[in-house]
Amino acid sequence: MFLVSAALAQQSPAAPKRGLPPVPGLGPDPVLPANPTAAQKEEHARQMAERTRQRWNYLLTDSLMRAKVLNEKPNALLVETVRGLKPGTALDADMGEGRNAIYLAQQGWQVTGVDIAEKALAYAQNRARVKGVKITTEVFDMAKYDWGTNKWDLVVLSYAGGREYADRVQKALKPGGLVVIEAFHMDATEKLQVVGGDYRVFFKTNELPKLYGATSLKIVRYEEPIGTADFSKQQLRLVKMVAQKP
């Protein structure tokens, strides 16, 4: 018993989890009172949505924050997937600062990017103009957005979305259309501090292929590698998937 305790005592303490940088001027999250009324729940949700919008506007448009936590190159899985494909219509859900949308536009795709962070979309539009390409952007919460039916040849979910997106993706894709997903494996929570308990972009082993396979999509590629995350730039376990609508 002593030897075990001594060995444990010699181990280095666990490294602190890394979270999102604080947003200047944004105080602590509002607290929902005990036994809240429907009106209080609605107001709390509104306040949290507004804080989320402010947080992402800051992280995605502040040059120092982008350099610290974001890969400014297009997602590698996306680049590999579309190489050699005939360009078509693409939806970049929760687009952010536009790195993937702009890349697709440069390859000839007609891209629509949707996000709640209006400043990030404006930043993306400016970058697109500088690079001489056109993208369409819409300020919207993807949870309330009309994805359409048989509308897109490609849907991109790069560190974006939630479990409820699977059915919407299946409905929105054209026959033969692809969805490209990269997100965090749940193991990444050992190193990342999850803001507000929001695990929408964290998935358990084989959770993604089960979710999307259940919608009738064909899983073309699935991996759970250790790699540098596009968001956070840390070495973490990731989930990567490409699926196709029959």
Labelled PLM ranges:
Residues A117-K119:
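Conserved SAM/SAH-binding beta-strand->alpha-helix loop
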Residues Y145-L154:
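A short acidic, Gly/Pro-enriched loop at the edge of an enzyme's catalytic core
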Residues G176-A188:
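Conserved beta-strand signature within the Rossmann-like core of class I S-adenosyl-L-methionine
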Residues Q110-D115:
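Conserved SAM-binding motif I beta-strand of class I
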Residues P16-L85, P87-G96:
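Conserved class I S-adenosyl-L-methionine
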Residues A160-L173:
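A short, conserved alpha-helix within the catalytic core of class I
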Residues K131-M142:
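Conserved SAM-binding strand-loop segment of SAM-dependent methyltransferases
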